């Protein structure tokens, strides 16, 4: 979609998959600028950004430091909390409470599990020998309510989007599977809550040193009027 839009604007576009030969391909193409449309590990964690900087190629969106920091959920939460942003707690929780377990450095909800109230063991997948998403996992209290997303472009927050998964929670399948979720724009929330969400997204974008475009993911508990920023992409 990004490439199609750029071509409609008159740009000459080469579509490149980020494989092991990425540097070789980029040297051969010698582009004027690289539009980074990657998700998850390598594309969002500063690795590809580092390759582009090493090659001296201009690129869109955030740089190495901001990308690496935003991908590391634990460190990003520390920075955001210091900036006054409400973030979920983290650490050990009473096993009788519902909780969310996720890899510390992954994207697109890969490896995210919701532990229901009363469960006394982590999901079997995390204990399995073939778990390949890192030794560190982040445990957070489960926040009921609405899934919200706020895009920030050049420091300015866009309209708040409400995301409604077809079933369960907003996991990998809900994000990328056909019919996995419905996006409601603008979100069905009070105007003052939308203003708070946009402000949190702008503060977070700046605190992490992001540039270009970012997206903040939030949860809103309408019963208790709690708005929490989960992470910045």
Predicted regions mapped to residue ranges:
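A short, glycine/Asx- and small/polar-enriched loop/turn
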Residues: 28-31, 96, 154-155, 222-228
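Short beta-strand-to-turn element immediately C-terminal to the catalytic PLP-Schiff-base lysine
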Residues: 112-118, 152-154, 221, 230
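Conserved metal-phosphate-binding beta-hairpin within the catalytic cores
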Residues: 141, 205-233
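ATP-binding N-terminal substructure of ATP-dependent carboxylate-amine bond-forming enzymes
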Residues: 1-65, 69-71, 75
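Glycine-rich phosphate/pyrophosphate-binding beta-alpha loops
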Residues: 40, 109, 166, 233
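Active-site nucleotide/adenylate-binding loops and adjacent lid/helix of ATP-dependent enzymes
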Residues: 13, 28, 68-146, 198
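Phosphate-binding site of ATP-dependent enzymes
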Residues: 122-199, 226-228
């Amino acid at each position: 979609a990004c490439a199609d839009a750029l071509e409609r604007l008159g740009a000459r576009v080469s579509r490149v998959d980020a494989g092991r030969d990425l540097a070789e391909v980029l040297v051969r193409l010698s582009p004027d600028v690289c539009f980074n449309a990657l998700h998850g590990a390598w594309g969002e964690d500063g690795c590809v950004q580092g390759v582009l900087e090493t090659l001296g190629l201009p690129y869109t969106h955030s740089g190495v430091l901001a990308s690496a920091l935003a991908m590391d959920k634990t460190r990003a939460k520390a920075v955001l909390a210091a900036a006054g942003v409400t973030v979920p707690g983290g650490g050990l929780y009473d096993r009788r409470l519902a909780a969310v377990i996720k890899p510390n450095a992954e994207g697109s909800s890969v490896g995210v599990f919701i532990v229901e109230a009363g469960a006394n063991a982590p999901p079997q997948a995390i204990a399995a020998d073939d778990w390949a998403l890192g030794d560190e996992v982040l445990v957070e209290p489960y926040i009921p309510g609405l899934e919200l997303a706020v895009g920030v472009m050049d420091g300015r927050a866009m309209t708040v989007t409400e995301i409604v998964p077809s079933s369960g929670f907003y996991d990998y399948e809900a994000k990328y599977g056909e019919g996995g979720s419905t996006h409601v724009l603008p979100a069905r929330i009070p105007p003052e809550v939308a203003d708070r969400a946009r402000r949190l997204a702008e503060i977070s974008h700046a605190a992490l040193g992001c540039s270009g475009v970012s997206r903040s993911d939030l949860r809103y508990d309408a019963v208790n009027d709690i708005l929490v920023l989960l992470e910045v992409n």
